[in-house]
Amino acid sequence: MDQDLDRAERGERGGGSEELLQEEINEGRLTAREALQTWINNDSPRYVKKLRQGQPELPTSPGGGGGRGHRARKLPGERRPGFWKSLRELVEQNRRKQERRLSGLDRRIQQLEDLVRHMSLGSPDPSTPSASVLSVNPPAQTPLGHLPPRSYFKLKRVDCGAGWDLRTTAAPGLPICELDWIQGTK
């Protein structure tokens, strides 16, 4: 109360109360805690009083700035470390899945290339389903007796209906569509 009268006599309107409180602390009349409480109750801006009483003036988000304004954001690691950890784990899982898929596709392509190579050479390999057909029929009668180079299969797209009658002339057990065969026998 005496402080208010002193300020009123000097014509101050709450502007220099921090200095007055500091003087009283230095002279031993107030403790720091009492001075802070006096400043909060009498001279502080309205939002400090509301924050002090547990009623924040501005809406704050639960992971947000926390006193730096309702739009203020913390640093990414400071915000939610669990979120970033789980995000990194998800990215790593997806990368591993994609690698497994690609390695499976590479194996399948290699199997098909080996199958084509065996069939074009006419070598009877018991693991291929159509090896018996190749060994019985002469290569001139088998539609796959003469094959283009491997690059042909990688560059062309599938056209299974053009010159092929898949029920009669295709080698049994050999899915021609998977080989991207495009030329027919005419």
From Swiss-Prot:
Signal peptide: none annotated. Keywords: Coiled coil, Host cytoplasm, Host nucleus, mRNA transport, Phosphoprotein, RNA-binding, Transport. This is Protein Rev. Residues 85-120 form a coiled coil. The gene is rev. It comes from the Viruses. The lineage of its organism: Viruses, Riboviria, Pararnavirae, Artverviricota, Revtraviricetes. Phosphorylated. The RNA-binding motif binds to the RRE present in incompletely spliced viral pre-mRNAs. This region also contains the NLS which mediates nuclear localization. These overlapping functions prevent Rev bound to RRE from undesirable return to the nucleus. When Rev binds the RRE, the NLS becomes masked while the NES remains accessible. GO terms for cellular component: host cell cytoplasm; host cell nucleolus. Its main location: host cell. Escorts unspliced or incompletely spliced viral pre-mRNAs (late transcripts) out of the nucleus of infected cells. These pre-mRNAs carry a recognition sequence called Rev responsive element (RRE) located in the env gene, that is not present in fully spliced viral mRNAs (early transcripts). This function is essential since most viral proteins are translated from unspliced or partially spliced pre-mRNAs which cannot exit the nucleus by the pathway used by fully processed cellular mRNAs. Residues 1-16 have a biased composition (Basic and acidic residues).
